Amino acid sequence: MNRVILKDSKIFLNVLNKPIIKNKNCLSLLNITTSSTTSIIKNQQINQFNKRNFTNTINNNKNENINNKILNIIERSHSCGEITSKDIGKEVIIYGWINSLRNLGDNVFLVIRDGHGKVQCYVDLKQQCILKSSVPNIDINERNSIEENIKLFKLESIVSIKGKVIARPERMVNKNMSTGEIEISVDQLQLLNNCVDLPFTVEHDSTAVSEELRLKYRYVDLRRDKVQSNIRLRSKVAMAARNYLINQQFIEVETPTLFRPTPEGAREYLVPTRHQGQFYSLPQSPQQYKQLLMVGGIDRYFQLARCYRDEDLRSDRQPEFTQIDMELSFVNTQMIYRIIEGLVKTLWKEAGFNIDYEFPFYTYEQVLSTYGIDKPDTRYDMKLVDITDCFNKDETNINLFKNALSQASNNFKESKPVIKCIKLDQVLPTLKSKHLDQITTESNSIITVQIKSNNEWKSLISKSISEQEKTLITERMNLKEGDVLLISVGPRFQVESTLGKTRIYCANLLKELNLLKLDPQQFNFLWVVDFPLFTPSDYMNEQSALLSTHHPFTAPHPEDIDLLLNPLSTPSDYSKIRGQHYDIVINGVELGGGSIRIHNSDVQLRVLEKVLKLEPHMVQRFNHLLTALSMGCPPHGGIALGFDRLCSLLVNSNSIRDVIAFPKTSGGKELMTSSPATVTKSELDELFLIQK
C-alpha cells in the first residue's frame, strides 16, 4: 500500500494497486481515506494533486498502464546484514542497493547492500525467476532471456528480492562477511529505482577520490562502509551518553539557537530579522542559558547542543558543531572530574575500548613548561628541558644567547628570558639534513645540534660554545651519538610556544620516517587545571589589556579571590589569579573544557568592568545574567565535550568531517547544496541589509 500526501488538502491517499480511471481531466482514485475519517475529495483538488505530483510520471500522450509502475512495498522480512545460518530454508524478502553483479556461467551473483550489511544472492539462469521493473522507462521484455533482462539492472540501483536462504558450499564460505555462510536463491527480482553513472564507486578507497568530490556527492559517499560505520557509531555513542547522564540524575533540556549578540570571544554568526537594526546571533555555546537553568533550579542539565562559531577552520573545526553540554548545581571540581571520567570510560567502552586508569592531573604551568602546549600528547617523550643555567650571560661566547639573556623582563613571568631545548633520541642518520632544514623552516628561531661520534657537535653554535657549556648540556640531556638537539632562546612564552609547536611537527615527521610508532588504540587521558583566569594581550607590555583565558564567567580559585577583589590590584596581579577551569585532554587533543562559574553578581560585574574593562554598552549585554545571579543563584559549574572530536578519536580519524553526515569544507562551504549562497536584493531589502 503506497501512501501519498496531498499538500493542499493534507489528506493521505492509500493507493491499493487498483485501476486509475481517466475521467476527463481528473483522476478517480479508489479507496481514498484520511488518517482519521473518510472524506470526499472534490475533482478540483484531485486535479491539483495530478498536476503537482504526477506531471513527470504520467505521459498523457502514451497509452500505458500506470498501475504496473505503482510500487506496492511489502514489509521486508530481514535486513541484508542480519540473515544467518539460522535462517537456512526460510523464504525472505530484502531491499537494497546492488553492490556488485557478476555473471558466472549458469548463475548471476548479486551482492545486495542496505544500511545494515551485505548479503550474496544468485539467479539460476536455468530456473524460473520473475523479473519486474517499477521504473517508468525501464521495461522487462518477456521475450528476452533472464540473462539479457538482468543487464538492465545497473550497480547501485535499488532492488527488492524474494527468495530462499540456502547454505553456501563450504569452499565458498566468505569469512569476511557476517552473512558469508549463506546466500539467497532468488525467486523474484524487482527493480525499484535505477541509478545513473556515479561520480565515483561506493567501494572506492577514500584516498583515491578527492574530498571535495566526496563532499559534493555526500549522499553517495555516505553509502561507503567506513562512513556508514562512523555515522552509526556516532549514534550509539550519543545514546550511551544520554543513558549515562540520565542515570546520574541529569535531565536533557533544549536551549534556544536564536540568541542575542554577546562579546564571549569567538566571532558570532549574526541572524538579521525583519525588524530594522535587530539581530539574533547563533550561540557559540549554551553557556549563559545553562547557567540560567541552574538559577531556575534544574540542578543537573545536559544536551547534545548545536554550537556555531565564525572562525578560521581546521580539520578539527566546523562552523557548526555538536558538544555534550553539562551544568550542575552545588558542585565542586572533584565531583565533575568523577562524573566526566565515568562518562568518557562509558563512551569508549561502547566503541570497544577499555579505559581502566584514573586520569592524571597537570597544572597549566606544568604542561607549558614541559610540553610547550596546554593540550600535550603524552604518548611520546621529547619534553622541554630548561638549560638556561648552563650559560652565563656575562661569559658565554654565543652572542645570540648573551643578548637574549641580557634582555630585561617585567612582572609577567612569561617575559623572563630562558633557553630551552628538546631532544630527538637516536634519529640520525635516518633524519637527514633536509629534514632538519624543514624543522628550522617551520620555526626559524630553532637552533639544531647534531651529535656525531666522539661527542662532536654539528651546529651553527659549535664553534662558539665552550667545553664547559657543552659538558653541562650533554649531562643534562644525556646526549649520545645519533641524537639531535633543538634549542630555542628568548622570552619564556615565545620559547615554550615555539618548542611546543616544533615538538608536534617533529613527532609527525618521525612517524612518517618510521622513527616514532604510536599505537592508534593507546588513549592517554589527562586533566589540565589551574589555568590563569586572565591572560595579557601582550606579555611584553605590563600595562596591556587583559583577556579572559576561557570566558568571563569562570570563578577564581578560592585562594586567589583577594587578588581579584583588591581595588589596588594591577594587571600583573590579575594575571596571577588562577581560574577554576579544567580541560580534559587526550593524545594532544582538547576533548573538552569547563569551569566552576561565578555565581555572585557583584563578583561577575567586577570582572566585566574592572578587569576586562568592557564599555558600559558591552556590560549591558549581560544584564539578564547579572540580574539572575542576584536572585538566589546556587554555586554551579559545568563542562562541554566536543562530540564530533570525540567520535573522530573513536574511529581513529584526523578530521571531524569523517564523523559528520553533512560537513562543511575547511573553507566553511557545503558543496552538496552550494551553501552559503547569495540572496536577491528584495530579500536583503526585507531585512534592511545593504549589499556593498
Swiss-Prot record:
Gene3D superfamilies, A to Z: Bira Bifunctional Protein, Domain 2, GAD-like domain, Nucleic acid-binding proteins
Catalysis performed (reactions): tRNA(Asp) + L-aspartate + ATP = L-aspartyl-tRNA(Asp) + AMP + diphosphate
Chain spans, region Aspartate: 287-290
Transit peptide: 1-61
InterPro entries per record: Aa-tRNA-synt_II, aa-tRNA-synth_II, aa-tRNA-synth_II/BPL/LPL, Asp-tRNA-ligase_1, Asp-tRNA-ligase_1_N, Asp/Asn-tRNA-synth_IIb, AspRS_core, GAD-like_sf
Binding-site positions, L-aspartate: E264, R309, R597
A GO BP annotation: aspartyl-tRNA aminoacylation
Enzyme class, spelled out: ligase
Cellular compartment(s): Mitochondrion matrix
Annotated CDD domains: AspRS_core, EcAspRS_like_N
GO MF annotation terms: aspartate-tRNA ligase activity; ATP binding; nucleic acid binding
PANTHER family linked: ASPARTATE--TRNA LIGASE, MITOCHONDRIAL, ASPARTYL/LYSYL-TRNA SYNTHETASE
Homology family: Belongs to the class-II aminoacyl-tRNA synthetase family. Type 1 subfamily.
Protein name: Aspartate--tRNA ligase, mitochondrial
Organism: Dictyostelium discoideum
Gene that this polypeptide is encoded by: maspS
